[in-house]
Amino acid sequence: FSFERIDLHLDENKKQSIVQNCKDRNYTSFGKYNVERVETIDGFKFFFDDDTWLMIRASGTEPVLRTYSESSSQEKCFDILEDTRKTLLD
């Protein structure tokens, strides 16, 4: 398995808006990755149907969202993180 992280630097209002959307369970997919279930311990961990996951954690000290992914390959991890970036910011 591969594990990757990308930090999204954005303004505080956008960060809080995304966190609220996570709390409200407004994200049912990130690009082609459909959310099967969500855990809310230490952030928002979205599990997909193919043994992969994505975690979104808001920094408590700066306007940053940290996104983490685990998958069977590094390429797929980065694909998940890119689809996540597009979903959250576009």
Regions found by a protein language model. Name each.
Residues 1-90:
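Phosphate-binding and adjacent anionic-ligand microenvironments
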